[in-house]
Amino acid sequence: MILAQTIIAQGDASIKASVNKNKILLGEPLVLTIESYFPSGSKIQFEQIDTIAHFEFLDKPVIDSSSENGGIKVIGKYTITSFDSGHWVIPSFTLAKGVKTDTIPIDVVFSDFNP
């Protein structure tokens, strides 16, 4: 189930960012998926993400690419977590001028205490 998703397109290029949950416990894994599409032969490239404030990467990203409708589709899946409680925001990602995702809010909480 995708809880947050943004899609922005300009011309034939597009980018979409989504997460599998918007609220996690401290240290709980979260999967960030970034899908981009751009026309074949364009100078647009998929940028690797290596840092996101307040989040840590748990594994190397899984990147997959395929040909689709005369262009290239690239999907990157990133397993991340946070050890900082609070309301954090995954920033927007830019594919090209004017082609970027919205930000994605994430709440990082302590576990509920039930004595």
Predicted regions and their residues:
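Surface-exposed interaction/ligand-binding surfaces
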Residues: 8-115
